């Protein structure tokens, strides 16, 4: 292994920045490999184009005749670009994308062949559902599942394959992917938000949920990554002493991007442009060899698809540049981990961002309505929102003084807090003309001025308002954005639905005017949501105590957090909003708990293997060198032997203690794992892995990392942190 380590270092030093050819302007490249609206205008008949646009904009069904026309046009377009295969591209609950490629090629007899692709192939396919996570919805012998075309996300060409974004459902109709519940949640929030918008503008017919993700990642040399079994098998380092220099000088964040990494980014951005992914920002992040990529905001379903596609593209482009891209939330101890901030907002088909203040008191009242309802939604469902970002890898990051804590709270800034306090003082019931004027001019009317200079940022907040959007910062870098976006849009949809019901009752039964009813309900929501608002330091112990006093959940581990998924409140929520049935909700819980168990199990096995098969033999080898040295000293320095060999003997003893510590803890870990595996109840098994197996990782790592500081660098088998983080 030490030979492999030094070979990796030697090879990595030979790498030069991979030449990236100059391309056309970004605006000319954008969407060239996407069957987007512009391409459809060229290839589709008028009827087919109208049919597809109605499906995209209004959710109308596409009849089979139109589907055949679309399929034929898609095929012609794809063949003109050298495409040979097509696939239904979907997002099963594995966390990555899935695809099965079929050729357009069909034989027609007499040694002849043609390219064929019809409406049947476009609209529906049948992959094996039993081979993907299904949470008990399907038996292994009940293999049938369906992928069905999602016309709201355009088909695209990836390599020589036409990729058709699809949903993935069981034969019995239950969702087996991230996209299906997301589409349902987006429909729910559209219905609920549009109904509220009609209080303020009768012309609004549709409300769209927007998402702008910020993808953080590490780039390390491909050869060095290959020399680390832990990175290869788990995506992170399970051991390794921190480098003497890490991020303490703050010299990496926004620094000059290294040439190799920059050329990787340039090629990546070209690929993204061709696929219609509107990437805009790139920069160094806080930790060495950590970077960030962010796009322009898009409709949420498309943004989720684009992020899933991007992560796949990044891995392929990184390999061409002799890099390995690490998405794990905490690949290296001692430096910052990676997240994926989800910037979320709602906008109307009339061009209004509902989370941005307007120019009139009425438009500002609309802003406050959506702003306060979002806060109320988070207050009611904070535990479910925490469950939406729970994973074995994100547990390493949350609450680690570099990322938001595991306690969900909302930050809105001092000035907006004052606005809410003033609204809280609104008179109950009817408002006098003077009160209305005061409220509209001096409270609601001044919101744009308040936001102009006073939307400060609090990086310790997991859910923060940043001027014209909410930023969900607790999402992990490996996550499929569909999960948190499904939950967020669902809870907001439910809250808006309840809000409308309460406002309509006040208008009908209390004889209040519309704005009076809105103010009255908002006032009560502000009072009910005080506990979720927090402006202070989320890292402090005092916040944990305060959050407990407020009744907020503090689920620090995934097994704890995921329970909120199957609470009576959550199941009822998803059923009422037609997002997921009870069966689907419970299946997702089971899938996510199983994924947690498997991740910890794999890491445990890999750590035990590295510790016993790589670290201990290396330590013994070095110890033998020291023993021979001590023997030689005894032969040469008979009288002074004790004094001249003292340090070597102490070192031999210290190494022995660490070897004993490794072996004892690995044995404990194996026994704890066996005991956990004997548990049939999946929830109890997850807690056993969390509480009995995982804590031993740190004990084993402690001894291994201490040995790294003691053993001769020439024979140490694993590539070290300083080599991985500072080779560029």
Where are these regions (language model features)?
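N-terminal hydrophobic targeting/anchoring segments and the immediately downstream early-domain regions
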Residues: 2-23, 140-156
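Histidine/acidic residue-rich metal-binding segments in metalloenzymes
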Residues: 15-119, 123-139
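Active-site proximal loops enriched in glycine and acidic residues that flank catalytic Cys/His/Asp
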Residues: 66, 90, 118, 295, ...
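Active-site-proximal loop/turn and secondary-structure-junction residues that shape catalytic pockets
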Residues: 66-70, 90-92, 120-121, 168, ...
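Short linear, low-complexity motifs centered on an aromatic residue
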Residues: 95-112, 130, 228, 235-237, ...
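Glycine-rich, acidic/polar active-site loops that bind/position phosphate-bearing ligands
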Residues: 143-327, 336-339, 346-590
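Composition- and surface-driven signal marking solvent-exposed, interaction-prone regions
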Residues: 231, 307, 329-330, 356-360, ...
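C-terminal amphipathic alpha-helical interaction region
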Residues: 523-728
